[in-house]
């Protein structure tokens, strides 16, 4: 009983947590397998940001309980945000789950599985479900292990645990990596359950993060994405500003100085974290990719106040304009919630106008979801579902049109692309531009991990297609 499959729901933070758990388990002698049908232990790392995410995981767990009836030694565990949010109450719906572990206890999973395995091997009944959702000081420092494919068996899952190359003799090398720098959130947005599921804001020591990035570079990683619930708040309680430079920008500077790291990204920030020092960093740190995920949530000042979001539409637009002044080809993505309680047609129109003006390349548009225990859930002015759906579809159509137009502008330009590995078909290769655009192209395995010049020959709404340039960069980008 040592084959483990981890299925991850939700954000990049969850992906990184799953990778760390997988690496810890592998170090204890467990095998991480890509196919859930081949496992003895299945762990669901869950999301709670919307009710639909929880229901999806509950549905999957309910289905897996049937497997336990046929396979008594099969172990089912629920990890992460839903485990933290619901705790032992999950057993009302899922009585056969063996393990429920919250967001500050991921590092305890190997020990709990060791105990379960020892009991099974000894023929001892398991007894009560293990439930551990307590807070633990220093837990932010435990998400540091990486499951690099070159260190794993050919049937193991790579770092994202969702992108296994089917049919390969061995997994491709890992070129990109997530690095957790901060956990928790103190923002208390009226719609959000994250402070409950992730706890208070906690940052890792800067030296530890830099050392982790240095080790990744030595193992072939060329791009790192720094992760945190509010990543721009990194270190504000632990470090001081130096010459007007925030701790987060100081961290960017140190990672930027590392040999081998060619690109730096980060997510998810908060608009209030974009002070002059961070904006200026885009002009003086060339490894910092010209792509910003900048959550908007609403373009109405009235709704922003109701959401407890401490900025205005005017300030948000100032940030976008300031970043584009530093880099004219800056790419933007965002988060928007439609149908927040009390949102009127006028409020939504203000959101639509700002959404259009900011010229986003990508957006995650969500219908407001009631989350029990949040201030917004108690409001009596909930927006009807059909109105939410109408507003949602309108913004998605605007996004589709804008993405199609902006991608079309890239036709016959030459983009710098980091070759990440074979695409899903295994017939071609994939990589991303500095602006986070996915590209598909023909290449050779020796180019994996290298920055190449790609002439864009075809564009869809979400993907670029191109051909390698043997020399030169071609004409300048023409972005509008």
Curated annotation (Swiss-Prot):
Gene3D superfamilies per the UniProt record, alphabetical: Methylthiotransferase, N-terminal domain, tm_1862 like domain
EC code(s) of this entry: 2.8.4.3
Cellular compartments per GO CC: cytosol
Protein origin, superkingdom: Bacteria
Annotated SUPFAM superfamilies: Radical SAM enzymes (SSF102114)
Reaction(s) this enzyme catalyzes, per UniProt: N(6)-dimethylallyladenosine(37) in tRNA + (sulfur carrier)-SH + AH2 + 2 S-adenosyl-L-methionine = 2-methylsulfanyl-N(6)-dimethylallyladenosine(37) in tRNA + (sulfur carrier)-H + 5'-deoxyadenosine + L-methionine + A + S-adenosyl-L-homocysteine + 2 H(+)
GO molecular function: 4 iron, 4 sulfur cluster binding; metal ion binding; N6-isopentenyladenosine methylthiotransferase activity
Radical SAM core domain ranges (all copies): 171-405
SMART domains: Elp3
Main location: cytoplasm
Cofactor(s) recorded in Swiss-Prot or TrEMBL: [4Fe-4S] cluster
All residue ranges annotated as the MTTase N-terminal domain in the record: 2-118
Boundaries of every TRAM domain copy: 408-470
Class of the enzyme per the UniProt entry, highest EC level: transferase
Residues that hold [4Fe-4S] cluster 1 according to the record: 11, 47, 81
Keywords: 4Fe-4S, Cytoplasm, Iron, Iron-sulfur, Metal-binding, S-adenosyl-L-methionine, Transferase, tRNA processing
UniProt xrefs under InterPro entries: Elp3/MiaA/NifB-like_rSAM, Methylthiotransferase, Methylthiotransferase_CS, Methylthiotransferase_N, Methylthiotransferase_N_sf, MiaB_methiolase, rSAM, rSAM_horseshoe
The record's free-text note on cofactor binding: Binds 2 [4Fe-4S] clusters. One cluster is coordinated with 3 cysteines and an exchangeable S-adenosyl-L-methionine.
Transmembrane segments: none
Protein family according to the UniProt entry: Belongs to the methylthiotransferase family. MiaB subfamily.
Name of the molecule in the record: tRNA-2-methylthio-N(6)-dimethylallyladenosine synthase
Lineage: Bacteria, Pseudomonadati, Verrucomicrobiota, Opitutia, Opitutales
Gene name of the record: miaB
């Amino acid at each position: 009983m040592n084959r483990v499959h981890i299925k991850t729901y939700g954000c990049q933070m969850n992906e990184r947590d799953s990778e760390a758990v997988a690496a810890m388990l592998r170090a204890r002698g467990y095998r991480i397998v890509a196919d859930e049908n081949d496992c003895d232990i299945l762990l669901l790392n869950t999301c709670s940001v919307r009710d639909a995410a929880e229901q999806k995981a509950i549905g999957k767990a309910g289905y897996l309980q049937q497997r336990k009836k046929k396979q008594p030694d099969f172990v089912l565990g629920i990890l992460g945000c839903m485990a933290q949010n619901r705790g032992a109450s999950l057993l009302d719906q899922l009585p056969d789950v063996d393990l429920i572990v919250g967001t500050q206890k991921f590092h305890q999973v190997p020990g709990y599985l060791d105990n379960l395995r020892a009991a099974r091997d000894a023929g001892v009944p398991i007894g009560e479900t293990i439930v551990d959702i307590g807070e633990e000081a220093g837990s932010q420092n435990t998400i540091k292990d990486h499951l690099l494919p070159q260190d794993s068996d050919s049937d193991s899952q790579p770092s994202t645990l969702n992108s296994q190359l089917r049919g390969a003799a061995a997994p491709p090398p890992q070129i990109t990596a997530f690095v957790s720098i901060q956990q928790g959130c103190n923002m208390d947005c009226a719609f959000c359950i994250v402070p409950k599921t992730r706890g208070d804001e906690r940052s890792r020591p800067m030296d530890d993060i830099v050392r982790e990035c240095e080790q990744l570079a030595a193992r072939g990683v060329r791009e790192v994405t720094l992760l945190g619930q509010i990543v721009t708040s990194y270190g504000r309680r632990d470090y001081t500003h130096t010459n007007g430079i925030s701790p987060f920008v100081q961290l960017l500077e140190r990672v930027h100085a590392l040999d081998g790291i060619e690109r730096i990204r980060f997510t998810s920030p908060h608009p209030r974290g974009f002070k002059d020092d961070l904006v200026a960093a885009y002009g003086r740190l060339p490894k910092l990719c010209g792509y910003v995920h900048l959550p908007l949530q609403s373009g109405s000042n009235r709704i922003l106040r109701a959401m407890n979001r401490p900025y205005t539409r005017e300030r948000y637009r100032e940030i976008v304009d300031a970043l584009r002044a530093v880099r004219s080809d800056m790419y933007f993505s965002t988060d928007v919630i439609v149908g927040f309680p009390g949102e009127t047609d006028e409020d939504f129109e203000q959101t639509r106008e700002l959404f259009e003006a900011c010229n986003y390349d990508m957006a995650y548009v969500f219908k407001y979801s009631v989350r029990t225990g949040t201030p917004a859930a108690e409001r009596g002015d909930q927006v009807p579902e059909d109105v939410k759906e109408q507003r949602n579809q309108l913004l998605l159509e605007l996004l589709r049109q804008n993405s199609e137009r902006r991608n079309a502008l890239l036709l016959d330009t030459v983009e710098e692309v980091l070759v990440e590995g074979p695409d899903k078909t295994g017939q071609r290769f994939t990589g991303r531009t500095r602006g986070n655009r996915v590209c598909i192209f023909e290449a050779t395995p020796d180019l994996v991990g290298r920055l190449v010049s790609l002439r864009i020959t075809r564009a869809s709404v979400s993907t670029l297609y191109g051909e390698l340039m043997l020399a030169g960069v071609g004409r300048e980008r023409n972005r509008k």
